[in-house]
Structures are given as C-alpha cells and as structure tokens.
Amino acid sequence: MRAGIAGAGIMGRLLAFALHNAGWQVSLFDHSNENMNCSTAAAGLLSPFSELDKSILLISSLGQESITNCWPRIIGHLPESVYFQQSGSLVLCHPGDQAEWIHFSRRILNQLNQNNCVFQKLSHENLITLEPELTKFETAYYFPNEAHIDCQTLMVSLKKYLDSIGIPYIANTPVLSIKPGEINTKEQRYHFDVVFDCRGLGAQTIFPDLRGIRGELIWLHAPGVQLHRPIRLLHPRYSLYLVPRPGNLYLIGASEIEAEDFSPVSVRTTLELLTAVYYLHAGFDEARIIKMVTHCRPTLANHLPRIKFADGLIAVNGLYRHGYLIAPALAAEILRGVTSNYQHLNYPEFWESYCD
C-alpha cells in the first residue's frame, strides 16, 4: 500500500514511522523545512495524569499508552540517543494560591471518581529527597509515572531515521488541496492508496472549527540549578511549567494563551515567566536566556483530537498542547483503523466519517 502524508510535524513523522514499519510505502510532504513547525516549539512534558486537571480520561489513556508502550519502542529504533526520562513530575504552588492548589487536586480526583492512585502529596522532607534544591516549598504533588522528552532532538532523529529507510521527504512544498487518494501541490498531482492529512493549522478546510492556541517558551541555561523533574507552578491565571534538559538547560513556558498569534514573545510573558522561575529557585538569577520561541498549536472546539476518515483519506488534527503526549498512541490507533477497515478501534470516540 502507498501512503502520502501531508504535514511533517510530530504526528506526520510518527505516522510515517508506523506505516513504514507495517510495510507501507510512504511519502512525506511539508510546507516548510523540517525545523519550522509547532512540534519544534514544544517543551516535551508528558503528563497524562496532571493534565486531568483540564483534560479528560481518554487523553490520559492515550498518554499512558504513549509513555509505556510507544516512546521506548520508537526511541529504540532511532539512529541516535534521545533524552527520555520517566522520573515523574511535581506540581507546586505559591503560598498565596492555596485555593488553586486545592481546586487542582479536586478536579483530578473528580475525574478518577475519588480513586487516587496517580499522585502523592509530599511532605517537605520527601520533597527535598526528590529535589534537594526546592527547599522553600513545604509540600508538593508528585506524579511518579509522568515523563519528559527532548522533542527537538527527537524530531531531528526521526527525520534521520525516515531518510535512512528511504522515505521521500518533499519539503518546502505547500499542499494546495487533498482528496481521497490524492495530494495536490503547485507543481504536481500525487496519487496514493491512502492520503493522511497531518497539516495542523493548514487543514482548516477539513476541520472548520480549527484554531491556533499560542504557546510561548523560553530556553534557559542555569549552571547554578540542579532540578531533575518537570515542575508545574500553579497560578490562577496561567500554568507555568519548567522542563529540565541535559547540560543544565531548562525550558519554561505557559501552557496556553487564547490567541492565534505567531509574533515574538511579549514583554509581559517574559516578565511573568522569569519572575516565576526565579521564585521557584533563586539560582535562576544568573541563568542565561538562550532563546525564546513562539508557535500556535492546532486546537478544535472541544480541545480534543479528531480523526476523520473516508475511503482513501484519513485526517487527524486538534492535538492541542498534547502533541508529544498522545501522537504515538494516535499513530498506533490510526494504523489499527486503516488496517482493520475501522473495525478494531481502541478510541472510537475520536473517529468520525468524512464527507467532502
């Protein structure tokens, strides 16, 4: 079977990976080069349980599948090492935000029907056993089964892997239209057995309710800081997160901003993020700002992914801020669907028939 994939972000690359390993002949199209999409602007926080604060159990299930079954297997195929750690994550709050702290845990427990088996409330002693430098915090929520991944290195390594197995990569080629079995560019019309649309915000003709949610990310180099796990600092207006990387690098950002805006990071966001991270750890006072990144994540009206299907066409979109968390499991789900004539689906709630 021949597959044409439009869109070479994380969803498109993982789908190319899955289809090739299932015996398909794959071609991959992208409107830009390999380093210019929202997948390269992510921090790589894999948090299926703490995301229950605002998401649903289906997203958590996809994320658990990705962390447990998918990511270790995918990384094992890649030509170079990719930083992936399942060492858990921490959720902290400012003493003045205790109400948000309580609401956060209640929202998660309500999703779990009060059956809490996914996080622990740590004492000060237990917290500094995990992270000795978080001395100012008296308590934290600890999610032991969460993880984080270096998504920038991952994207590069996936591209090298796809190149090494001979998958054609047609870059800097905007896809003008998609039909069942057909991808049209300015230069040529391409025919396939199945076309997979992974274009994100470029697929608004197929997903009319698609919009962009802005994400802003600051890279810091902080030799005076030794933190080992992702940290989320609760705030009533936004959720700050910090994700560590090797070499004393730290990525900090705000989870979401309701604006389809690709402009550079604002002064307000910069001040808020840097103030918050300095409150988290005074060692960030001498950190160096390496770069600032913004992009918009494709989001549907209900903040959930959707898979539209027809004979010769599958379109997946709306991964929102959960791209690296759910894309591996979604790729496996799409492969199950297309190879079983949509009879053997683990997540039928995300599927709907597409009529052009």
Indicate where each model-derived feature is located.
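Helical element adjacent to the flavin cofactor pocket in flavoenzyme catalytic cores
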Residues: 140-178, 190, 194, 198
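Dinucleotide-binding Rossmann-like beta1-alpha1 core, especially the glycine-rich loop
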Residues: 44-126, 130
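C-terminal catalytic lobe of FAD-dependent flavoproteins
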Residues: 287-356
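Short beta-strand to alpha-helix junction loop
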Residues: 54, 58-64, 94-100, 141-157, ...
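Active-site substrate-recognition segment that forms the wall
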Residues: 11-18, 22, 45, 80-84, ...
